[in-house]
Structures are given as structure tokens and as C-alpha cells.
Amino acid sequence: MSYKINRKTYAQTYGPTKGDRVRLADTELIIEVEKDFTTYGDEVKFGGGKVIRDGMGQSQVTREDGAVDTVITNALIVDWWGIVKADVGLKDGKIYEIGKAGNPDIQDNINIIIGSSTEVIAGEGHILTAGSIDTHIHFICPQQIETALASGVTTMLGGGTGPATGTNATTCTPGAFHISRMIQSAEAFPVNLGFFGKGNSSNETNLFEQVNAGACGLKLHEDWGTTPSTINSCLNVADTLDVQVCIHTDTLNEAGFVEDTIAAIAGRTIHTFHTEGAGGGHAPDIIKICGENNVLPSSTNPTRPYTKNTLEEHLDMLMVCHHLDSKIPEDIAFAESRIRRETIAAEDILHDIGAFSIIASDSQAMGRVGEVITRTFQTAHKMKVQRGPLPEDSDRNDNYRVKRYISKVTINPAIAHGINRFVGSIEKGKIADLVLWKPSFFGVKPELVVKGGSIVWSQMGDANASIPTPGPVHGRPMFANYGQSLLKSSFTFLSKNAIELDIPNKLSLQKNCLAVENTRSINKLDLKLNNKLPNITVDPQTYEVFADGVLLSCEPLEEVPMAQKYFLL
């Protein structure tokens, strides 16, 4: 017997279906469900009197014969490849299948088998994204990691040794000793971690030593001297050992101009940090490098998006982070040379057209580690308000724009650093690093974070309450944060050479270590939905930025969404 249900009631029961639209947080961004993999009338849902019961939606199939460990039911997936409604099956800590869950004995077209060994996470009315990847971490304090996890970040790549003066300014873990100790410290944390060695050496032997010790990449930073010579030697080593090079270029143009840096890079793949320049880089025109096909350009979140407060807060941040002295005029001039309203405004638009590909934090070194996702979608909102729908979108939804922006914090940083085989998207076979959001809190506060197939973080009420929901409700660590579960649910990224040299055993590591790969043969065209290559020019007098001859300019935003109303404490 069939039963007809109206769309509103259906959405309230099973979540939105194809054609339904959802607002993201309090932004002007609207997404529309493109496809529904579930079957009307055959949906699975857990609860008293619901479907997932023995002989109904739950089959007799054992885990050994194919039942999954966990099913996330009726979730609205937002990923670079689509915005779809589906069940998601997890097994052995990985994404097993995306599609339709249930009991194949009584239901058709089941590709995710629910058995008595299957746990259920209710995804109805929730958005599911891949865990975000932050590739610009200054490992200044370990407390960053919990803050990042609480925001939906599950992978952190960067450098540092703690609150050392060098780490406060640069994302480098210099030398084999420090790399070893940081890799060992990663055993304590419930996220995926990887560490960059210091790339500033014209002696390649020093660089080989660091990558062989376990560095998953190398970082060139102007505070250590980013000269044409160090750029060349660093890229030579990276090409030999297949690791990524990240670069913070020469703000003062002491060793050359942006053209000299481009010449030293010589067409080799490189990840440029804070490519606009406020975070550092050739003044005033480092931004033009985003038009090079071998350059993987990223932003850091202090300039995301351009608001009325952006310029004012930057000077003090710069002075602290780069060990400058406000009593020295040259230090003030150095800081002021990096802060340009014209290039920051252009950065918004370059993100919106897909010319800038990645957004990261620059944690505690001008950036805020817990705001990567928030700042990304604040930028998307600002561009929607100021520029209207993208050509690929319509007045009905912002699907393409949302997919473009989610790519900047998930799949694109994964591709850039050679870890997309493992993380970065919701795709079969990848590690089950997933984030579940209430739409009203999207990009601000996750409802639940799954790490390696186990729940690692969740909104949770009073532990002494009779049910989970009484206040105070806030994000808290869950069981995958502890003991052996932590060690089995998260991973450490190393160079391929380090794994071949048996570094995990030499350092007595218990976490599984994964090798980065395919970092040298990629280019910007490999990045998803963010691979435009405009010809960028910068007026040296006015700092105005032009893309293919068109002036890129926008006004600062007076008020941003996803902000104070979500953070009352």
C-alpha cells in the first residue's frame, strides 16, 4: 500500500530530497539537492518503531559477509563532486560505500548492508562533509589541535617545535632531531599530522637529511632567507624525493623580485602560501604568481574575507609574529609594506573565480586555527552578496560556488600535498574522516566528527544528565580521542623515503604512518573547481590588481555571518 507524503513532512522525517534547498548557517548561500540515492518508501531510519530492526532494515548478514560497521543514514553530502542525499557505509575505518543502505533480503538496490554488527549515526537533516585539511600550521602549542578538531579539521600539516621564536614566525621543523620529536609527539593527538622541514638551505645535503628523517614536505620562508639559490636547491630535493615545497617569498625584494622567484622555481610545482601578500611575499605583486600553472596558490584566513577590520588588525599581528620592533622605523615599514587594501580585496574575487585554490589558517602566526572553514564560507557569502550568482549557478541555488569553496579546504590541499589517496573527499576507499553539521551551524560548530571510522568529537550535554541533551551543550572529546583507539583512528604523514628507511620503527611509533606521493607531477589544473589561470598585473603605484585586464576590486564587508551570534560565551 502506497502512502503520499508532502515535501515538508518528508524533509522533517528523512531529510531534504532532490529539489529541496537548504541555507548554510546564516549566510546567503543556498544549496539544492542534486540527486537522492535513497529510495522513496524504502528509506532506513533508526529508532523506536522505525526501520532498522532485525528482519526489517537490518539483515542477518554478518560483518564477515559484508555488513558495515557504521551507517550514516540519509545524509546530505556536500563535496567537490556533488551535493547529494545518500546513506554512507563505513567499514574498517574507511568509507565503504555511498548509496542505499538496508537489508538486501527484502529491499532492492542495496549497496550498504546493515547487520547486527552495524552502528547507526542519524544523518537525517544534517550535512556531511569530508574532514577539512589545514596545510599552514605553525605548531606553536598543542592546544591548537583540539581547537582545530572542534571546528571540523581532521588533518593538519605544517612545521614548528613549540613556542620557539622560529616557529612563531615560520612553519618549519628544522633538522632531524626536531622532526623526530614532533613525529613522536603526534602519537598523542587524534588528528592526522605531518611536518615540514626547513627548506632554506643552498646545501642540498641538509634538506635530504630532513626528508629522510620524516618530513612530509619542505618550507621556504623569507625569515630564513628565501633566495633564488635556496629555492632551487629545495625544489631539486623535492623533485628527487617526491615531497611538496611550500614557499613564503621575499617581501623586501632583497634577493630579487617576483619575476626572479618565478625564474628560480623554473616551472616546478610549488605551493605558495598567503599568495595575496599580507602574510608575506614580494611586495606589492606576489599575487601575480597565481596565474602560473605550476603554482598551487593558497590564502591564510586573517585576510578572509576582506572586512572593515582586516587592515587595522594586521599591523600588530605582523609585528608580533615576525619578531619585529615597533621602535625601529624599518621594522614598521616592513610590516606596512605587506598590508594593502587593494590586493586583499582582489584576493576575495580571485577566490570566487577559482584562481586561488586553497585556504588555510596560519595558526597563531596571524591566523586562527579554529576558523578555517568559517572564514572560507564567510568569503563565499561575501562574494554572493557583492557579485551575485556565479555563471555556473542560478538564482535558485549556489551549488557550484559552495562546491568550489568546500574544495579549498578539503580535496585541493590533499592533492597539493600528495595525500588525496587517503583523505580530502567523501569517496569510496578513503579514510572515514567525516564531519556532520546541523545546517544552521554549518561551517561554525560541527555536530559530530568521525575520525578513522570512530566518533572523536561531538556536541554533548551534561555528563550527569539523564539524557545526552541537557546543557551546557558544547563540543567535547569522545572515545576515539583516547587510548589505542586514538592510535588506530589517526595517522602520521611521512615522506616515502622515511618509511622505506624504517623511521616508524626507529622512532617506536604506534600510529600508522602513510607516505605522501605524487606531489611533483601535479599542477594547478589538477585542483578541483579552482584552477583558473588569469594573467595578473599589479599597478606598482596604486597596487590595483587586474586579471586579464579587468580591475579586481570590492568593498569591505561591514558585518559577516557565522560570527557573534554563534559565539555568545
Swiss-Prot record:
It is an enzyme of class 3 (hydrolase). GO terms for molecular function: nickel cation binding; urease activity. The keyword Amino-acid biosynthesis does not apply. Substrate binds at residue 221. GO terms for cellular component: cytoplasm. The active site is at residue 322. Binds 2 nickel ions per subunit. Optimum temperature is 55 degrees Celsius. It is found in: Cytoplasm. The modification N6-carboxylysine is found at residue 219. Residues 131-569 form the Urease domain. PROSITE patterns: UREASE_2, UREASE_3. GO terms for biological process: urea catabolic process. It catalyses: urea + 2 H2O + H(+) = hydrogencarbonate + 2 NH4(+). InterPro entries: Amidohydro-rel, Metal-dep_hydrolase_composite, Metal_Hydrolase, Urease_alpha_N_dom, Urease_alpha_subunit, Urease_AS, Urease_asu, Urease_asu_c. Carboxylation allows a single lysine to coordinate two nickel ions. The keyword 4Fe-4S does not apply. Pathway: Nitrogen metabolism; urea degradation; CO(2) and NH(3) from urea (urease route): step 1/1. Its EC number is 3.5.1.5. Ni(2+) 2 binds at residues 219, 248, 274. Belongs to the metallo-dependent hydrolases superfamily. Urease alpha subunit family. Heterotrimer of UreA (gamma), UreB (beta) and UreC (alpha) subunits. Two heterotrimers associate to form the active enzyme. In most bacteria it is thought that three heterotrimers form the active enzyme. PANTHER family: UREASE (PTHR43440:SF1). This is Urease subunit alpha. It comes from Prochlorococcus marinus subsp. pastoris (strain PCC 9511). The lineage of its organism: Bacteria, Bacillati, Cyanobacteriota, Cyanophyceae, Synechococcales.
